[in-house]
Amino acid sequence: MARRPRRSDSSSAEPTLSPQHLLALVRSTIPPIHPAGRPFIAAGLAVAGVGYRHRWARRTGLLAAGACAGFFRHPPRVPPSRAGAIVAPADGVICVIDTAAPPAELSMGDAPLPRVSIFLSVFDAHVQRAPVSGEVVAVQHRPGRFGSADLPAASDDNERNSVRIRTANGAEVVAVQVAGLVARRIVCDAHVGDKLAIGDTYGLIRFGSRLDTYLPPGTEPVVRVGQRTIAGETILADLP
């Protein structure tokens, strides 16, 4: 009579979950938080801690902390390896594809350039990433209004911060952070002379808004209005 083969002692041992492996699983599942979001998360946790005896205060604090953790998430991204690619500088939905003069404060002239605008909702990741590899040759902040960022006039009227990047081949791409109705705080960590790699994080807009990308003359966008973008990964166009 045939017998079922027995497993050896070494193979019958149950796999163990070490603390290091558990930590690696958590890190791969939960994206890190951008440093700018930590004070907001801490404030929510503080409210929950101070009011832990009151259910409404505890829940409100925990919900606020969780929402801020989602808003300020900083997920890892893998930029394309294709030479000459221009990637989306922000998560969101493409709301405008047109031609427009670059921001006047950059002194690049008034000749229209191809422009791709991305609208960020409060549910999108707030961080912005370099659309190309190159050197930061100009950073200019301009005060303005805080109108709804999905309106066409937002690019001209709202507060904005422009970063001009020059690639190794001399092509220039401009990424403009535009404030909005809810987003009233632009953070830019890029400075003139910095060398950025495509997909590097250089700033954020608190609680959504808009990102305008001005492309070199002759560039043809390969995206469409209404398309969702992933910062650092979605290709907007190729350098001419």
UniProtKB/Swiss-Prot annotation:
Stretch forming the signal peptide: none
Catalytic residues in the record: 209 (schiff-base intermediate with substrate)
One GO molecular-function entry: phosphatidylserine decarboxylase activity
Cofactor: pyruvate
Subcellular location: Cell membrane
Listed NCBIfam families: PRK05305.1-3 (NF003679)
Quaternary data: Heterodimer of a large membrane-associated beta subunit and a small pyruvoyl-containing alpha subunit.
Enzyme nomenclature, EC number: 4.1.1.65
Pyruvic acid (Ser): residues bearing it: 209
Family in the record: Belongs to the phosphatidylserine decarboxylase family. PSD-A subfamily.
Note describing how the cofactor binds: Binds 1 pyruvoyl group covalently per subunit.
Site (Cleavage (non-hydrolytic)): 208-209
Name assigned to this protein: Phosphatidylserine decarboxylase proenzyme
Posttranslational mods: Is synthesized initially as an inactive proenzyme. Formation of the active enzyme involves a self-maturation process in which the active site pyruvoyl group is generated from an internal serine residue via an autocatalytic post-translational modification. Two non-identical subunits are generated from the proenzyme in this reaction, and the pyruvate is formed at the N-terminus of the alpha chain, which is derived from the carboxyl end of the proenzyme.
Known role: Catalyzes the formation of phosphatidylethanolamine (PtdEtn) from phosphatidylserine (PtdSer).
Gene name as annotated: psd
